[in-house]
Every structure is written in C-alpha cells, then in structure tokens.
Curated annotation (Swiss-Prot):
Disulphide-bridged cysteine pairs: none
SUPFAM superfamilies tied to this protein: Cytochrome c oxidase subunit I-like (SSF81442)
Gene name linked to the record: MT-CO1
Reported cofactor(s): heme; Cu cation
Protein name: Cytochrome c oxidase subunit 1
EC number assigned by the record: 7.1.1.9
Pfam families: COX1
Family, per entry: Belongs to the heme-copper respiratory oxidase family.
Record field: catalytic activity: 4 Fe(II)-[cytochrome c] + O2 + 8 H(+)(in) = 4 Fe(III)-[cytochrome c] + 2 H2O + 4 H(+)(out)
Length: 514
C-alpha cells in the first residue's frame, strides 16, 4: 500500500507532496552549504581549506538551491497541487510521466553530491565554464558527474513542462477560455514553455563539454578551432530564461495571495498581468549576453543587450504596480502570507533596481564578478523566489494538510527571516561597490566589517529555518482543523475542503461563465 501510494503514485496531490518534501530537504542542504560559505567569509583568513573546496561548496550551493529547491517546490510542488484544482481537471495529463519527473530528481541529486565527494570536487561555479571545467583544470570524474546530474534534472524538467503545457491547454472545461484561468495557472504555463525552449540548449552545451572532456572533441578548445565563448553563449541562452523560470511561478502565487488578503474578488489588471508575464518570458530569451559584457563584444552588441535588458523592467513594473493597485482600497488582512507577499513586492523591486544598474554595459565592466552582482540576484532569489515560496506555503498549508499554522509564530518567523536575509545581502552592495570580487575564499582586511555583518545575518536566517520546522511540527501536533474557507471566483482550489479528497473532479466540471 505504502509502496503503491508513494513510489508508484499517479496522483497529482501525492506527487506534489513528494516534490514539496524533497524541495524542503534540498533547501536544508542548500542552506547548510550557504552557511559554510558565510562562515568562511565571516572574517579574513582561511577556515575550511583551500579555494578549491570553497568553490565546490559555492557551486553545490547554487545547483542545490536552483535545481533541487526552488524548481521542485514552485513548479513540482505548488504546480502539481494547484494547477489541476484551479482548472477543474481530475489530474495531470500524463500522471505516470509526472511520477517519473519526480523520481528523476533524487538520482540527479545523488550524482551532484557524488561529484563533490570524488577527486577534488567540481569547483567551477554553477556556470561550469571551460577551460576551468575542462579535463586539465578539473581532471577526474567530478565535472562529468555534475554534467550527468544536470542531464537528469533537465530531463525531469522537460517532461514536467510537457505535462503542464498539455494539462493547462487541454484539460480545462470546454467552456473555459485560456483567459479565464487563474494567474498562477498562467505563470506555470509560461514557465513550462520557457523550460521547454531553454533546457535543450543547456543539454547541448554540457554534452559538448562532456565530449570535450572525454572524447577529444574541441568545441570549446581554440587549439582545435573551438571557442570557449561559444559555451558561454549556449549556457546563458539557457541561464537567463532559467532565472525567469525561477521567479514566474512566484509572480503567480503572489498575485493570488495579494488578491485573497486584500479582500478582492480578482487581481487588478488581469489581462495586463498575463501579457506582462508573456512579455517577460519572450524578452528573457533575447538578453542573455548581458552576462557576458566583459568578454569583449562589439559596442553595438553591448548597446543592444543593454537596452533589451532594460525593456524587461517595463512588464515587471506593470506587475508591481498591478499588485499595488490590487491592494488599493482593499480590506487588508495582515496575515503571515500577506506579510510575505508585501515583503516580496518591496524586496523584489529593490533587486530589480540593482538589475537595471547592472544592465548598463559600461557600469557592468566594473561591477561584473563583484559582490554587487551577488547582492542583486540574492535579492530577487533569496527575497523574491523564497519569499513567494514561504508566502505560498503558509497560505496553502491548510489546503495541503487540513491543519492551520500558529499565526503568531508564522509572523515571528517572517520577521526573523526578513531581518536575516536583509542583514546578509544588503551589505554586499557596499562590498561590490568597493570592488570585492566573487568566488574567493579570502579578502583584504578592508572588507572585514561588511562581511562580518553579512555572516551574522546568515545565522539569523538559520534560526528562521529552524523555527519553520518547529511551526510545521506544531501544526501537525495541535491538529487545528480548517473550519470554513471564503470562496471567490479566483480561489476555486479550496472548493473541495481541506484537505481535498484523494480524487477531485472525477466527473467533468460544469462551468457557468458570465
């Protein structure tokens, strides 16, 4: 029974739960790695060992957080749980493929962990640039294991993307147009399209790297007519859409949370929100070289990538102001989920502004590979994606479990986390402006103060993580069941009660559309 339910599952709710548990576990691993980084940088001098081991930790931290925490939780966890419920589908379009998508992830994670334990580990950074990732600078199996790990995670995501696209387009009630589906469903659809287009390019790039390392090809080796810059183009053509893949489902969740706790029946500017997400998805594919301003591109190329990157700020601004307009005049309920959503809007905007700074190719020459970049992307990830995940979790936890979290603890948890992440990453802007480079395990004494403060902030965030584990335990131990749910047209996932029955929408849904 246990094996049939949890290993051979074809139920979108159970698979969503598996994704959430896996992502939570990976999140703990990623947090542990990040604390190793901040412990090393807490004061000048060496703590862990040489720079190779430090870079292995940095690389693993990035891969774990991106491929095994944010994507499984947002797309696999919330996506699987909510999309079928929101469109009235009995399950996903391909339930067994759904199960395979999940079970490809633990072996992938295993390969990544193995890569850090054989030879010297993969100390390449998550970008895995050759020649550093070649078989000279990284002899041994480490980088090959990392590449195989990425292959598995990529296949998992591609299959998941096919599944979500088919489900969302094909399994709605016949009377329901695509423009009547909730914004979270839209965000997952657009994310899935991005995955489907971006991941094959990454697969091509890392497969060429694999053959360069093992079969004497020279795709990225100038000695044989190759070019390492080709790898950078291939990687970032995936890498930039990837960062939008990480944030778009968060946009969808924030739209639902803000609408719900503002007492509104619909978000402000629904069509504007949809088109903004589609614009972001499209523009995300034509700005990749802004990661490469320092490799010596033509001035006209740099001008194009600078302006194209800045244009992404427009649809993003549409979303931010639509969230604010949704709040406007609402009967705002200061629930923990709403606090996460408001924190998201503020901090994501701050991260977006530093992104506009970095979009300037001339400024980026100075700021590239400094802590300014680290601060920028941790504001949009550690305070964008993670805040959206936390907000979505405390909002939908009663739906998933049938129990309610302690609201006071949840607000305290938000406060600790808010202080922790800001204390960690705000000082890094100053470090970057003073020229402290990324990916070094040591630094001149002049940078000590801000690094010490940053490392203290990371340990505050750690207490927040531990408090969250306690909150979840407390909710299951206290068993406060959900009594009533306020239903509107925009939150139909609550229709079947908390938690919903194992099978929902077993017969086709009748939709009466105005």
């Amino acid at each position: 029974m246990f094996v049939n339910r949890w290993l051979f599952s074809t139920n979108h709710k159970d698979i969503g739960t598996l994704y959430l548990l896996f992502g939570a576990w990976a999140g703990m691993v990623g947090t542990a790695l990040s604390l190793l980084i901040r412990a090393e940088l807490g004061q000048p001098g060496t703590l862990l060992g040489d720079d190779q081991i430090y870079n292995v930790v940095v690389t693993a931290h990035a891969f774990v957080m991106i491929f095994f925490m944010v994507m499984p939780i947002m797309i696999g966890g919330f996506g699987n749980w909510l999309v079928p419920l929101m469109i009235g589908a009995p399950d996903m379009a391909f339930p067994r493929m759904n199960n395979m998508s999940f079970w490809l992830l633990p072996p992938s994670f295993l390969l990544l962990l193995a890569s850090s334990m054989v030879e010297a580990g993969a100390g390449t950074g998550w970008t895995v640039y050759p020649p550093l990732a070649g078989n000279l600078a990284h002899a041994g199996a480490s980088v090959d294991l990392t590449i195989f790990s990425l292959h598995l995670a990529g296949v998992s995501s591609i299959l998941g993307a096919i599944n979500f696209i088919t489900t969302i387009i094909n399994m709605k009630p016949p009377a329901m147009s695509q423009y009547q589906t909730p914004l979270f469903v839209w965000s997952v659809l657009i994310t899935a399209v991005l995955l489907l287009l971006a991941l094959p390019v990454l697969a091509a790039g890392i497969t060429m790297l694999l053959t360069d390392r093992n079969l004497n090809t020279t795709f990225f080796d100038p000695a044989g007519g190759g070019d390492p810059i080709l790898y950078q183009h291939l990687f970032w053509f995936f890498g930039h859409p990837e960062v939008y893949i990480l944030i778009l489902p968060g946009f969808g969740m924030i739209s639902h949370i803000v609408t719900y706790y503002s007492g509104k029946k619909e978000p402000f500017g629904y069509m504007g929100m949809v088109w903004a997400m589609m614009s972001i998805g499209f523009l995300g594919f034509i700005v990749w070289a802004h990661h490469m301003f320092t490799v010596g591109m033509d001035v006209d190329t740099r001008a194009y990538f600078t302006s194209a990157t800045m244009i992404i700020a427009i649809p993003t601004g549409v979303k931010v102001f639509s969230w604010l307009a949704t709040l406007h005049g609402g009967n705002i309920k200061w629930s923990p989920a709403m606090l996460w959503a408001l924190g998201f809007i503020f901090l994501f905007t701050v991260g977006g502004l530093t992104g506009i700074v970095l979009a300037n190719s001339s400024l980026d020459i100075v700021l590239h590979d400094t802590y300014y970049v680290v601060a920028h992307f941790h504001y949009v990830l550690s305070m964008g994606a993670v805040f959206a995940i936390m907000g979505g979790f405390v909002h939908w936890f009663p739906l998933f479990s049938g129990y309610t979290l302690n609201q006071t603890w949840a607000k305290i948890h938000f406060t600790i986390m808010f202080v922790g992440v800001n204390m960690t990453f705000f000082p890094q802007h100053f470090l970057g402006l003073s020229g402290m480079p990324r990916r070094y395990s040591d630094y001149p004494d002049a940078y000590t103060t801000w690094n010490t403060i940053s490392s203290m902030g990371s340990f505050i965030s750690l207490t927040a993580v531990m408090l969250m584990v306690f909150m979840i335990w407390e909710a299951f131990a206290s068993k406060r069941e959900v009594s009533t749910v306020e239903l509107t047209t925009s939150n139909l996932e609550w229709l079947h009660g908390c938690p919903p029955p194992y099978h929902t929408f077993e017969e086709p849904v009748y939709v009466n559309l105005k």
